Amino acid sequence: MNVTSHPVPEEAGELLTRIQRELNLSTKAMSNQLGITDVWMRRLLNNDIIPSQHLLKAIVTLYVRHPDPCILNHRRDLAHRFTQACARTYYARNHHRLQQRCHTLFHFPELTVSLI
């Protein structure tokens, strides 16, 4: 029996740290660029919170704006992985509430089960 190991999913905070390093910005400089406080930036980097849709867009835009053409694909890939990590984290933290909302909205428990 072949067992394939799945890589451990990357955390949004780790990917944001890589983005910050590649942009060569301090925590304070990056928080200023994004219009958030240093405390919020540290919480994002520590994976304590996930960014809102608007902040997520601002981070990705800041990261992929004006890249060197030879690293554009790398930056797009990392931005995509960061977005996926945020989505996984959001789902992991809110799956029960999402499940309840689906049940309430659709009144079909079998739909709720298929989402999990």
Give, region by region, the residue ranges found by the protein language model:
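A short, Lys/Arg-rich alpha-helix, primarily the initiator
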Residues: 1-24, 57, 101, 105-108, ...
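Short glycine/serine/threonine/alanine-rich loop segments
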Residues: 25, 36, 65-68
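Short alpha-helical "recognition helix" segments of helix-turn-helix
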Residues: 29-31
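Recognition helix of helix-turn-helix/homeodomain-like DNA-binding domains
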Residues: 34-51
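Short, basic-rich loop-to-helix N-cap that marks the start of a DNA-contacting helix
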Residues: 47-61
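Intrinsically disordered, low-complexity basic tails/linkers immediately adjacent to helix-turn-helix/homeobox/MYB/SANT
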Residues: 60-77
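Short, charged recognition helix plus adjacent turn
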Residues: 72-109, 113
